Each structure stands twice: as structure tokens, then as C-alpha cells.
Amino acid sequence: MNINDTVERVTDGADLTVDEAREAARLVFEEATEAQIGALLAALRAKGETEAEIAGFAQGMRDAARTIEPDREPLVDTCGTGGDDYDTINVSTTAAIVAAGAGVPIAKHGNYSVSSSSGSADVLEVAGADVEAEPPAVEEAIETDGIGFMLAPVFHPAMKAVIGPRKELGMRTIFNVLGPLTNPAGADAQVLGVYDPDLVGTIARSLAHMPVEHALVVHGAGMDEIGIHDETVAAEVDGDEVREFTIAPEDLGLDRAPIEAVSGGTPEENAADLRGIVDGSVTGPKRDLILANAGAAIYVAGETDTLAAGVERAAEAIDSGAAATKFAALCGDDEAVEGDGEAASTDSAAASTTAGPEDDD
């Protein structure tokens, strides 16, 4: 198999198998020229990427990544594609911290912002976290603190090969959806937001081809998160089975609120909201939005039998101080962590623009 033959086949309308797509990704990262990469990406876009092709490219991207193997399970990631319609508070990042407070081991994959005001790396950097930590340090953090952050450019250096072709093409390609599928810690469970409701089923069926045990793929009426302003389109992946459904805020025991009530701002403003939500001083719609998404992470980890029960556990993690303790650990505030033994015990009881998740918050 060579890249030119693959481009020709895809241009003629042929679909690649998972294994063929995985090999095509290897060729992209190791051998292909920028012209060949651009031709393949454009051909896939014109044909329409299949679930098998997305899964194969994701596995090929994982093959090329710097990976870690923390001795914690089930590892959970809360990572979206970015590219949605709203600049909200940093949802997936805050939700990950709250879920960690509920005892869920978190391997958070993220990046700096591309087009939104504040990506996951932007807000965590402002808060004091070492967002560019090397793989061994992140592995240790997950094992010791129950939460670690993996910056996409640090863990996916092979993605440099596609920077030029993607910029020149100037359109969305298969790589716009791959970041959340390529967790370098091999997360067992995920809450994965997508920018287009039509992608929910496609990405869920792609995950069913991959070694992920339990996942929720969601689109919340314009958000790549579970929303509280309207119903969320969702697909649950349990092994190789996929179930599509909708989530209403009322199903989670939460009130609806207009999208404007959860608007974000600069990284500094979003970091202040993050801190306030995890320490309990920020309430109302912003807290509820985080509870919805943290509850989903707790659910896919197998800690609860329902999403609504996950929301209740998320609220307990905030109210007990456990979420604030995890935030302090992520930001390297050892004094705060050591000073809150009760909250800490909850865990034991229970080139950035193209390298991975884009605008994930």
C-alpha cells in the first residue's frame, strides 16, 4: 500500500477499512509529501469519511503518539472537538476536575484555543497548572493525584506533518474530529462533544471500533457539550453497541437556562469561574452546566447507574471540597492539597493549532 494508490482509490469513491486507514495515517506521518497529504485529506472530505476510516486514522494517530500507561482505572477523558457556536465557560476542563473530585481517575487531553476565547490549556495555564508537562510527569500525576493534563502538541509531535496541508486546504478535514479519539493514556471511558449533531452517531460508531469500554458522544444544541439551554443529542457506546437518545436538563434534575447565562470570557475570567465553581462560590446555571457534564463523566466511569445519579455525585464532590482539592493538585498547590485531608480522601474511597483537540475547553 502506498499513498498515491490510496489517494486514487479514495478519489474513485472507495472506502478504506480500519486497517487500511490506520496504514494511511502511518504513511501521512512518516512518508508522504505535503502535496500527497493534502490530496488524501481533500479526497476523504469529498467522499465523506466513514466510521471505519475515522477509527483507523485515530488508531494510526495513537500509534504515532507519545503514550503513557497510568496504573489507574477506569481512566476517563472529557474532551470535545471544539468548533461549536458558543464561547462558554470552560466546560470539559471544569467537569473533569469535578469528576476527579468524585473519585474518577482523569486523563484530560486538551490544547490551546484556536478560534474560541479560551481553550483548556489557556485556562489551566492561567490557573497555574504546568500544561506542557512531559509524559512521565503526567503519568505520575494521574497515579498520585487522580488527575493529569496532556497537552496535544507535547503528546502528538507527529501531527507537525499535517500543519502545512491543513492550512493550505483551509477546510475541515478528518483531523478536526480525531483529537478526542486519540487520548495518549488510552482512556477507557469518555465524554466526547462534537460540533455538529450529524457527527454524534458517526463518532459513536467509530468509537465502537476502538478499545473504549464506555462513552457518551454529545452535541448540546450548538455546543460540543451536554447543554442546559436545550436538549442534547447523544449516543452511548457500551463495548461495540451504540444507543442514540436525547438528554433534557430536566432528566438530570437541572433547570433550563439561556445560553447567555453560561457565557465565558478571557482565560483569566474563565479561570475565575472555574475556581468559583469547584470551590462552591459560583452557583446557578454555570454550576448546573458543569454538573451535567461532570455527571456524565462519573456515569461513563461506572460510578453510577444513571446520568442523574452522576449529577448528584458531582454536586457532592463540589460541596465536600473534594473538587477544589483536585483543582489544587492539578495546579501544583501542594499546601492546599495537604491541608484538606477529608476532601482528598474522596478519591481513594471511590504548534498547537493542529496537534489534537482544537478549542476543547
Curated annotation (Swiss-Prot):
* Pathway the protein contributes to: Amino-acid biosynthesis; L-tryptophan biosynthesis; L-tryptophan from chorismate: step 2/5
EC class: transferase
Gene name as annotated: trpD
**What does this chain do?**
Catalyzes the transfer of the phosphoribosyl group of 5-phosphorylribose-1-pyrophosphate (PRPP) to anthranilate to yield N-(5'-phosphoribosyl)-anthranilate (PRA).
Q: Where is the composition biased (Low complexity)?
A: 343-355
Q: Which cofactor does it need?
A: Mg(2+)
Binding, 5-phospho-alpha-D-ribose 1-diphosphate: 80, 83-84, 88, 90-93, 108-116, 120
Q: How is the cofactor bound?
A: Binds 2 magnesium ions per monomer.
Q: Which UniProt keywords apply?
A: Amino-acid biosynthesis, Aromatic amino acid biosynthesis, Glycosyltransferase, Magnesium, Metal-binding, Transferase, Tryptophan biosynthesis
Keyword Amino-acid biosynthesis: yes or no? yes
Pfam family, any one: Glycos_trans_3N
Which residues make up the binding site for anthranilate 2? Answer: 166
A cellular component annotation (GO) from this entry: cytosol
Q: Which HAMAP family match?
A: TrpD
Do you know which InterPro entries this protein is assigned to? Answer: Anthranilate_Pribosyl_Tfrase, Glycosyl_Trfase_fam3, Glycosyl_Trfase_fam3_N_dom, Glycosyl_Trfase_fam3_N_dom_sf, Nuc_phospho_transferase
Q: Which domain of life is it from?
A: Archaea
Q: Where does anthranilate 1 bind?
A: 80, 111
Recorded protein name is Anthranilate phosphoribosyltransferase
Q: Which GO terms describe its biological process?
A: L-tryptophan biosynthetic process
Report the PANTHER family cross-referenced here. ANTHRANILATE PHOSPHORIBOSYLTRANSFERASE (PTHR43285:SF2)
Query: Which Enzyme Commission number(s) are listed?
Result: 2.4.2.18
The annotated region (Disordered) lies at: 338-361
According to the record's subunit comment, the protein's assembly and interactions are: Homodimer.
Residues the record lists as binding Mg(2+) 2 = 224-225
Q: Which annotated residues bind Mg(2+) 1?
A: 92, 225
